[in-house]
Amino acid sequence: MSDSIAFPNLGIYLPHVIKSFTVFGYEIAVYGITMALGILAGMYMAVYVAKKTGQDEDDYMNLNLIGIFTGLICARAYYVIFSWDYYRLHPLEILDFRGGGLALYGSVIGAVSTAVIYALVKKLKPALMLDTACTGLVLGQVIGRWGNFFNREAFGGYTDNLLAMRLPLSAVRADEVTGLMMEKAEEIGGETFIQVHPTFLYESLWNLGVLMLLLLMTKNKFKKADGEIFLWYLLLYGIGRFWIEGLRTDQLLVWGTDIAVSQLLAAVLAVGSGLLILLIRFVFTGAGRRRKS
């Protein structure tokens, strides 16, 4: 039962959820496979949207190939920087990607930076490229979050809501377990189980909704200017991440504070992008229409 995962209020019980398997003597983490699937799906989505909007698909294939490396490096760097108290004592683990430790906001920063630089070098429109690339980015997040499911990580505090997830205490890190979890813990077959918010699932479902809205905006020519779809991504993802991050028990904190860095970043990006959307909708494009009339 030590590798089981259950959603008791949904009547779902998974007796054996593996973290890794071995091929020719080499251990392969399911987390890594999940991330790879997310990357591949995101690549396809960006190329698909580029084709539908009359852009050169090759530009997005090239961008994707570069973005894989920059996204992974930035995702790892973000996690290591805000977990430095641990990694300064275990420096050899900094380059070990197999067990997790990738921060999605880091991957966003890496992917966005890569898209802007690539567009400038190729003399393309950075804002248009961000509008297209963000659809692939959010699909990658929808799938990639399931890596946390297999790793039994990135969960929230105790809950008994409909989606509550039950995990063996022995399968999670001790520093992610709260007092309330232990108060509500159950003994089943000699094993101690805790019940938590499946925040990975919340974020995956939230991002799926964001993706659907972005695709509708793209299809219906909703945007008033290049870059607006990307701003809507930052706004909607930021709102969801701010809420979900507040539930988690493994938050990366701003040094010397109790402030969750991803929650702070989500708030800043959501507010900033929301203001820019208002400016695009009611100031910049409005002024342009008045001048034409």
List PLM regions with ranges.
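A feature for loop-to-transmembrane-helix boundaries and adjacent hydrophobic helices
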Residues: 1-293
